[in-house]
Amino acid sequence: MSTEARDTIFIGKKPLMAYVTSTLIQLANIPSVNIKARGLSIGRAVDVAQIIARKTENAGYSIGEIKIGSESLESQDGRTRNVSTIEIEVKRNQA
């Protein structure tokens, strides 16, 4: 498994706490994790990052770099659509 795959959590339709738990497990092993989402899942990605940063503040996690953008995707009817994307870095604070 590549480093890119291990340090990235893709947000979908699972319960919010499933993504929070997955991110915290990854942060126990590596110093930073990227949370990625697109379209309607962007709000969930922001919620995951905020839960980790605010609720585990004493554990030493913070939000790092945030990247926003868009991707062109072809819809089922053959038209090209632009879909918004977000990537949020959550990292362990240095002791």
Curated annotation (Swiss-Prot):
Acetylated. Acetylation at Lys-13 decreases DNA-binding affinity. InterPro entries: Alba-like_dom_sf, DNA/RNA-bd_Alba, DNA/RNA-bd_Alba-like. GO terms for molecular function: double-stranded DNA binding; RNA binding. SUPFAM superfamilies: AlbA-like. Keywords: Acetylation, Chromosome, Cytoplasm, DNA condensation, DNA-binding. It comes from the Archaea. Belongs to the histone-like Alba family. This is DNA/RNA-binding protein Alba. The gene is albA.
